[in-house]
Amino acid sequence: MQVNELFKQSNTILLDGGMGTMLQAAGLKLGARPEELNITDPALIEGIHAQYAAAGSRIVNANTFGASAHKLAGSAYTLEQVITAGIENCKRACAPYGALTALDVGPLGELLEPSGTLAFEDAVAEYARIVKAGEAAGADLIFFETYTDLYELKAALLAAKENTHLPILASMSFEAGGRTFTGCTVESFAATARGLGADAVGINCSLGPKEIFPMAKRLAEAVPGNFPVFVKPNAGLPRADGSGYDITPQLFALQMKPYRELHLFAAGGCCGTTPEFIKLLNGTFAGCTPGRPAHRMPSVLCTPVDTVTVDGITVVGERINPTGKKRFQQALREGDMNYVLEQAVSQAEAGAQILDVNVGAPGVDEPVLMEQVVKALQSVTSLPLQLDSSNVEALARGLRVYNGKPIVNSTNGEPEKLAAILPLCKKYGAAIVGLAIDEKGIQPKAADRVAIARRITEAALAAGIPREDIYIDCLTLTASAQQEDVLATVQALEACKKELGVRTVLGVSNISFGLPCRTYLNTTFLTMAMYAGLDLAIMNPSSEEMMAAVYAYNVLTNRDKQSTKYIERFADRVPASTALAQAAKAAPAANAAEAELTGPYAALMKAVEKGLKGDAAAHTRALLAEKQPLEVVDEALIPALDIVGAKYEKGTLFLPQLLQAASAAQSAFEEIKTAIAQKGEGSASKGRIVLATVKGDVHDIGKNIVRVILENYGFEVLDLGRDVPVETVVDTVREKDVHLVGLSALMTTTLKSMEETIAALHAAKLDCKIMVGGAVLTPEYAEKIGADWYAKDAKRSADIAKEFFGV
C-alpha cells in the first residue's frame, strides 16, 4: 500500500498490536528502555514488526513510542539515533508485505503548564525534533497515541503540521467514565484534533473493546461521516496473578464485531494484544467498508473538559472587555490578572457558556497581553473562549496557547482582513465570526448585509473552514441613533440562517446604548433575535432579565426538554419584593458546604475552589490579622480542599481544576508559613509519607499529582522520584521513620518491581502501611501483591492518609 492510498481503502484496514507485550514475552529486562533495542537488538524488533505485518497489519508502528528527550535522558543514544534505527527496522520488516511504517509517538511524560511545569512551546520544540527525525528516517506517517492531555496533543499536532508533510493519526486514551485522566471529553478531542489537522482520530489503550465501544460511537458521531476513525483497545485488564490480560484473541475478535457498524477506517490492538489477535481481526472486519452516512455536523466550541454544542441560543459573557471601563483598563495596564479572572469566574457563575476576551486598551501590548490572559483564564475556568480582537498578532498568540477549539471575533468583508485572519483560524482549528461590513461601511438594507455575509462565507469555505464553524454578525446598531435600521439587523440574521446555513452572533447590549432602562430594550431585542435564529448572544450574564428570557425561550421552543434547565435555575427563586423572598434570604443553607461558604472564611474558600491564587493569598493575609494560622488552615483551607475533592470524585470537577485549587491553597499556605515564622513557631506536619515510582518505571505524572494534593493537606512528603530502586525505598522508610508509603507504576512491565518493593518492606519488618496506584493496577492486584490500600486517584490517596494519621 502506498501512502497516497491510505485513506482510499475499500475495506477497514488493520493496525498492529502491542509492542510492550511482545517485548515482555521476549524477556525485556526491568528498567530497560524498549526503544534502545532498535540499536542493540534490531533482529528482535524486526521480527515483531514482521509478525504483525504477516498477520495483516497494513500500518505497523515503529518501536519509537518513548523516543523523546525526556524519556531518553541518560541514554547512550540520541533521540535521532533511536528513531532512525526504529524506522529503518520497521520498514525492512514491512517491505515484503506492503505495509506502511508509522512513527509512533507517545506523551513526553510531563504535565504541561498550568497543571504542570512543562512550557507549551518547549513541548512543541521537543515534538518538532521527534517528527523531523521520523520524516528524515523515512516514516510513512505519524501515529500520536495514548494521550490523556489535550494540550499536549495540540503541541504534538502543531509540531507535526509545522515541520513535516506526513499524514497524522491521533489517538487519546479514555477512562470508563468517558473522559481522559485529565478530564477531556471525546467530543472535545474530536473537535480539537480535527481542527488542528489530524487526518484520522481514534481511541486506544486503557480499556477493552466492550468498554471503548460507546466512546468510539460518540467519536464517530462527532466527526463527518467521511472522516477516518480508528480504535486500538487493550486485551481487557491485567490478571491479578500476573499471567497476562483477561481477554483471549478469540474473545477479542468477537467483542470487536460491533465496531463494524461504525465503519472504521482502521482497527488494531494495544496492551496485551499480539499478532494472533490481529490475525483474527481479518475475519471480524472482512467486507467492512470505511465511512459513515453524512450527517449534519454540530458547531462545537470547547475546552478539554467543557464541550459546548451551539444548537440554538448560547450565552457569551461580554464583561472581559476594557471598552469604557476605566477600572478594567487600569487592571490591564498594571498586569492585575486577579481582576480579569474575577470577571471570568463571576460570569461563569451567572450562567455564561462562552467568554468573550478583549484586552485592547490604550498603553498595553495587546499581543503579549492576549497570550497572558488566555493562559490565566484557562487556569480558572473551563468555559470556551471567544478571542475578540482586530489585531492579527494578538489573535495568533492567543490561538496558539488556547487549549481546545475557540472562536475568533472577528473578520469582516474586506479582502485584506479575510486574507489575514482566515488562515489563522484554519491553522488553529478555530471558528470565525464574520461581521457583515466591508470597506463601504455598514449597509442599512438587510439584503446588502447578507451579500457581504455571503462573500465572507464563501471565503471561509475556500480557506478550508467548515460551514458549521462560520458565524455571521449582522451588527447591532443603537436604537437611539439608528432606530430605523434595528429591524434590518433581525431580518439579515434570519436570511443568513436560511440562505447561507451558517450560525449567527450579535452583541445584544449595543441596542440600548444612550437610552434609559437599558435592560428592557436589551431583553426585548434579544427575544426578537432569538426568534429569528440567533445562536450566540454576546451579553451580560448577570442580567437576570436577559438570562430569564434565554431560559424561557428554550422552554417555549422545546429545546429545553421537560423544562429541566429552567427548573434547575429558577425553582428556588421568588420575586425579590415578596415576603417569601425575605424569608428565603434568612433560611439556613441547604447543606454543610453551603453553610461554610456563608461564614467568615467564605471568600478564601471560594478563592481556593476557583483556583484564584492571588485572591487566596490576599484573603489569607486579611484573615491572619484576626485569626490564628492553624485556625485558618483547619476552618478554611482543609474544608475547601475537601469540597473540591468531593466534586472531583463526583465528576463535576476535573484534574486541571483540582490542581489549580491545590495551587491556590498553596499560595494561602505560603502566607500562613510566613505568619508562623514571624511568630517564631514551627509548622507541625500531619504525618510523613514516602512516595516513589518503582524501579524501571519512568512515568511519574500521577505520583507528582498525589504529592501536590498530600502537601496541601499538610502532610510532609518525601518524594523519591521515579525509577527508584527497592533498597532506596526501604532505606528511606527505615532512616526517616516513615509509617506510610505510596508506590506508583504505570506499565505492566513494572508491576513486578512494585511487588518486589512491597515484599522488601515487609521482609525488613518496618512499621509501615503501603498504598499503591497507577493506570495498570486494580484493587484485586493491589491486594495480591500485599498492598494495604489501592488508591485510584490523588483524592483517594489523601483520604487514605487522613484515615491513617487520624486527621
Language-model-derived ranges and their functions:
Residues 1-473, 477-807:
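Domain-level signal for soluble alpha/beta catalytic cores
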